[in-house]
Every structure is written in structure tokens, then in C-alpha cells.
Design a protein with these regions (language model features):
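Periplasmic/extracellular, small/polar-rich flexible segments of pilin-like filament-forming proteins
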Residues: 60-180
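Intrinsically disordered/low-complexity terminal segments and short unstructured peptides
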Residues: 9, 24, 37, 42, ...
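Membrane-proximal N-terminal amphipathic helix
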Residues: 37-67
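Generic N-terminal leader/processing signal
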Residues: 1-5, 40, 173
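N-terminal single-pass transmembrane signal-anchor helix
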Residues: 3-33
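Extracellular/lumenal glycan-associated surfaces
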Residues: 34-37, 165
């Protein structure tokens, strides 16, 4: 009776295949993480551009109708802390602007308890912030002059400054918003 030869992979061949799969997996994980970070940064840049656009349209709404409301406050928009705070809260929740890096909050909290209380049903933190306390992924609104964001000069005094942060809290871009 002739012997039947069974062909199979050797242990070395199997180990080489496992090693190749491991290397490809580690390359894939690194590439995926880079893709995620790039997408998150692009999201924050879009949040910044939308914040500027929506803020300007709220201000324009007041110019068209003095009886309207901007950021849930009466027109005209004023360069005051309550408008700054309410703009951040309103833009975050009315336009669904989120910081993609922010940790989740407990559902059912109130944003801005003083000037424009907003009950938050979801478990996320707004992506537009009022004043200091910036984090990567945030869009912040301040009133100029405000150290260290904008020094006192005729081009910025009495105006809002909208900024966005990334790469260990480095300002990536800004826009001065004039209400006139």
C-alpha cells in the first residue's frame, strides 16, 4: 500500500504568518489613530467656522429686526459678558456644536444657570465656551481687550474674539467679530 503524503504548514511557516499579521495590525492601528485625530481636528475647525458664521447671522438678525432676539437675549447685541456667555451656550446647543474630545457630562444638567439657563438633556458638553478655560477641541468667545487673548488696541477693543484650540491648547485660528 502506498503511503499517503499529507501536506501541511510547518510551525515556522505558521509563526511567520502570525508575525506578519501582527505587524500589519500594528500599522493599521497607528494609521487608524492618525485618521481619527485628523478627523477630530477637522471637526473642531468646522465648529469654529460655524460658530463665526452663526454668531454673525445672530447679530445680523438684530440689524434686520430690533424686536428679535439673538442668543435668546433681546436685540441689539451688546459686547457684554452676558451676551458672550449666552452666545456660547446658545451656539453649542441650538446648533449642536460639540467638542469631539470632551468627556461626557451627566444628562439633565443646566448650562449657564445665571444669564440664559439651558437644560441639557444629553450627556455631552458644549463645544463653544465663554471666556477662559480652553481645552483642545474647544471654540472660545472672549471680549477684547482680554489678556492674553487680545491686547488693547483700536482694531479689537469692544469686539468679540472667537478662537479654536488644538495641539496641547495652542490657538489654531481666530476671528474678531464686530457687532456694528
Amino acid at each position: 500500500m502506498p503511503k499517503k503524503i499529507v501536506k501541511a504548514f510547518t510551525l515556522i511557516e505558521l509563526l511567520v504568518v502570525v508575525a506578519i499579521i501582527g505587524v500589519l495590525t500594528s500599522i493599521g492601528v497607528v494609521a487608524y489613530n492618525g485618521f481619527v485625530k485628523s478627523a477630530q481636528k477637522k471637526t473642531v475647525e468646522i465648529n469654529f467656522n460655524n460658530t463665526v458664521k452663526y454668531m454673525q447671522s445672530e447679530i445680523a438678525k438684530c440689524k434686520l429686526d430690533k424686536d428679535a432676539k439673538a442668543f435668546s437675549l433681546p436685540c441689539p447685541v451688546k459686547v457684554q459678558s452676558n451676551y458672550q456667555e449666552c452666545a456660547a451656550v446658545y451656539l453649542s446647543w441650538h446648533y449642536n456644536i460639540k467638542n469631539p474630545l470632551a468627556t461626557k457630562e451627566t444628562a439633565g444638567w443646566i448650562a449657564s444657570k445665571n444669564n440664559c439657563p439651558t437644560f441639557v438633556y444629553g450627556d455631552w458638553r458644549g463645544g463653544v465656551r465663554s471666556g477662559d478655560g480652553q481645552r483642545d477641541g474647544d471654540v472660545n468667545i472672549v471680549i477684547c481687550p482680554r489678556n492674553p487673548y487680545c491686547s488693547s488696541n483700536l482694531d479689537t477693543d469692544g469686539k468679540f474674539k472667537v478662537m479654536w484650540w488644538w495641539d496641547n491648547i495652542k490657538m489654531q485660528g481666530y476671528k474678531i467679530i464686530n457687532i456694528d
